[in-house]
Amino acid sequence: MSFEVPSPYVWDDSFRVAYDNLDSEHQALFKCIAKCAENRADAAALADLVKVTVDHFADEERMMAKTNFSGLPEHNKIHSEFVAKIKSLSAPLDDATVAFAKQWLVNHIKGIDFKYKGNL
């Protein structure tokens, strides 16, 4: 399922997962992807996206593990695949890569992360 990518590319309340720390981290991910989109040749922006993503996924998976969330194995696999993808990238980023990252985050939050709302 594909969800509409907001324009401008900013986090809004429609992405709220109801855990303040994760909502803040999701906001940071939106900002990192937007920065990469605006500065496609900026290797530091891409490195920051990788770091923020890895840190967020670790926090989210820790919360899932603490509550024995049944979707953790699938969620971990999805996270691992995305991290591998963004770690393989190098600047400058092309249009397709930027579009992929924007769409992936939107779909992931609304289609995957929403499954844990109220369960962590």
Curated annotation (Swiss-Prot):
Residues annotated to bind Fe cation 2: E60, H75, H79, H108, D113
Residue sites binding Fe cation 1 per the record: H26, H56, E60, D113
One Pfam family linked to the record: Hemerythrin
InterPro entries in UniProt: Haemerythrin, Haemerythrin_Fe_BS, Hemerythrin, Hemerythrin-like, Hemerythrin-like_sf, Hemerythrin_metal-bd
Annotated GO MF terms: iron ion binding; oxygen carrier activity
Keywords attached to this entry: Iron, Metal-binding, Muscle protein, Oxygen transport, Transport
SUPFAM superfamilies reported for this sequence: Hemerythrin-like (SSF47188)
Function: Myohemerythrin is an oxygen-binding protein found in the retractor muscles of certain worms. The oxygen-binding site contains two iron atoms.
UniProt family annotation: Belongs to the hemerythrin family.
Protein name in UniProt: Myohemerythrin
Organism whose genome encodes this protein: Riftia pachyptila
